[in-house]
Amino acid sequence: MIDKPKLMAHLRTIPDYPVKGIVFFDVTTLFKDAECLKMLVDDLYEHYKDKGITKVVGVESRGYIAGAALALRLGAGFIMARKPGKLPAEKLSESYSKEYGTDSIEIHADAIDENDVVLIHDDLLATGGTVAATYRLVKRFNPKTVYMSFNIALDDVPKLDIYPRDAETYSILHLTEHDA
């Protein structure tokens, strides 16, 4: 069961970071509290335990924490979606735009197969640029199904046209920038 007031009390917000006009929701303060971290992972587990997830893709880097813990609970493999140049073997790459610049994301070329049911997990959904690129990248592997989950969704931030609205998405907390 989610205790939103407890999570909100542990969520740090930083105005004008990384650039002026952006409110940064720092989930690391949720992860350092054992009860908050357990609450997040337990909630995600309850939502996905019957979906047949075989791989969880954590998006660099804050998607790794709850994503890896959730993969362990689900009995699924864990895949790291990384920034360029961090993976040592053959990889696939996808570029994207975000609120304050452009980047790309990579996954090892042998990470996912067509029999997998994949859950992409990231800490926060803002414009959807990062997860859209990760979704496109995962879809290139032709898995059976792709789900997406987030610790936090910023509902008042407009999603980019490239955001995959056809994918089943779950967010634990729905916030606005006014919640900062």
Where are the predicted features?
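PRPP-dependent phosphoribosyltransferase catalytic core
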Residues: 132-180
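Short, glycine/charge-rich flexible loops or terminal/linker lids adjacent to PRPP-binding catalytic cores
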Residues: 77-119
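Active-site-facing substrate-recognition patch
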Residues: 1-53
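Short glycine-rich phosphate-binding loop at a beta-alpha junction
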Residues: 53-60
